[in-house]
Each structure stands twice: as C-alpha cells, then as structure tokens.
Amino acid sequence: MKTLGEFIVEKQHDFSHATGELTALLSAIKLGAKIIHRDINKAGLVDILGTSGVSNVQGEVQMKLDLYANEKLKAALKARGEVAGIASEEEDEIVIFDGERAENAKYVVLMDPLDGSSNIDVNVSVGTIFSIYRRITPVGIPVTEEDFLQPGSAQVAAGYVVYGSSTMLVYTTGYGVHAFTYDPSLGVFCLSHEKVRFPATGNMYSINEGNYIKFPRGVKKYIKYCQEQDEATQRPYTSRYIGSLVADFHRNLLKGGIYIYPSTASHPQGKLRLLYECNPMAFLAEQAGGKASDGKNRILDITPVKLHQRAPFFVGTKSMVEDAERFIAENPDE
C-alpha cells in the first residue's frame, strides 16, 4: 500500500523545476495533522475542550482547540523552513517567519487549523483546511500581505484533513484529488482513494435551514425545489447538515451533493472565509469535477482585498450548483 510520503515524492515530477520544497511543505502539514489527530482523540481527558475566553479579529470566541491546532500547525510549518509565512483564521494578521531560510522560501500557507471546532465537545467530525500559494514578492525579503491576497486560481495546492471515525487527508496539486487514510498502528497516511471525482448526480443538500427566514429569495426557492417530489430528477433530495464544512464537503464529494452557506440578512457578505475555507474547497471541488460559486461568480476568480474576507459559498456536484445559480438568477431579491 502506498503511503502519502511515497505518493507525494512520486508526483513531484508534475511540477516544472521541482526541487522538493513543496514535498517538504506537504510533509509538514502531514505532521501537524498527526499531532492534532492524536490530541483530538483524547480531548475529553485533558483540558483542551470548551472556549478559550479569547476572541478573534471577527469578534468570535475562540475554542481552546482552535488555538492549540493553530500553534501546532504553525510550529510544524516553521520548523521545515520551506514556508515564508502563514495566514490563519485564528491570527489577526499574517505571520512572517524570520530567518534567512524563511525569507528565501517560495511558498505561503493559508489555513483554518480546526474547522467546526464547536463540534468537538459532542464528538462530531471536525477538520483542518489548508491552501498553498507561490509568493509574489521576490525571495530574499520578508513576505507581505500581497503574497496572501491572491485569487484562488493561483493556488499551487490545497486540501483538508477530516478527523472522524477515521482520519483522512485529502489534497490536490492541480492534478486530481487524492485521499489518504491514517493508520494509527503504523503512524502513516495510506492511499485509499485515488483520483476522487464527484458523482455525476447528487441527491443531498447541506444547509443550515434554521436560517431559512434570513436567506435570499433565490436560495429559498432552491430549497423548496430540493424538497419537491419529482421522479424524473429523483427528488426530493435528502437534507444532511453536520455544521462542519470539512465533514459536509467530504460526504458530498464521495456521495454527491451540494453544500450551501449563502448570504443572509445578518451576514450579507456571507459567513465563510474566502481565503481559509472557500478557496481551498473550491480548488478541490473543481479538480474533482465539481463546481464552486458565490451564487453568481466562480469562487476561484475572486480577487481578495482583505485577509478575513467572507463570501457566500455554493460547492459540490456541478449540476446541483448550476441549478442553485439558476434559481438565484431567476429570483432576485426586490
């Protein structure tokens, strides 16, 4: 059975002028994921559950595990020396790594260290999301915010780790999507799903229907469409919503479906972060034959203007995302 490390080295030839930095960078993320996996599994036995009492730049109270995962991933990436700096959902500003090696590094990493962390207390799946870009500024100097404010189409690699009944790392470098399952007895990620593709059709929709009254008119119409009886299109669809983007996306990737987090009356710009959540998942979706949109525009075409920018998010089976876009276009809010 092929391990993640073996697979990454084998695929290194996909990159022109590859010299091993990206391979080492992905290995650092793999190490961070293994550490987080270990500690999530005993979270109820040590004091890393619950809130930290600290708020992030968006005014949201951070969970203890959010901060813990952020520090572990940051340390793993810094130790490898292949990263010039990071941006994280848990950090107010970019983190610039110091030292000559970091200044000469080609890549920057953006991450959501622990997506869905509020689910930890009740033992529901959570995940880590990461996104890798080649820096814009010249090597040899510290990175700037400009290196992180790139459209998603410029991503070199992206992926996530889902910590569930098993721990899985799923990633793409622009040559398909591959998934690796963690074997705790050996301490390695083993290739379990190669060239993952969204099914051509799906019958699941994932959305927090508790916010229905706040949704745009087109989204309400689409939800009703999902719930209507129609044998020709195999409706009604099944509603499945975990409340963890990674877990919901992962299920829909394997089974077929759409994940929706639209703009609402209370969050007119959307709730999910463009850089840390939408872009990496959009890259994965497109590489797996799916689609990702803000309801009108391709997610990967959006040029961000700030680190913690938000966006409405529609991602999943291509035909389902296109149906949702059609309902939004045909039913504008007055």
Swiss-Prot record:
Mg(2+) 2 binds at residues 112, 115, 277. Its EC number is 3.1.3.11. Keywords: Carbohydrate metabolism, Cytoplasm, Hydrolase, Magnesium, Metal-binding. Mg(2+) 1 binds at residues 89, 112, 114. It is found in: Cytoplasm. It is an enzyme of class 3 (hydrolase). GO terms for molecular function: fructose 1,6-bisphosphate 1-phosphatase activity; magnesium ion binding. Belongs to the FBPase class 1 family. This is Fructose-1,6-bisphosphatase class 1. The lineage of its organism: Bacteria, Pseudomonadati, Pseudomonadota, Gammaproteobacteria, Enterobacterales. The gene is fbp.
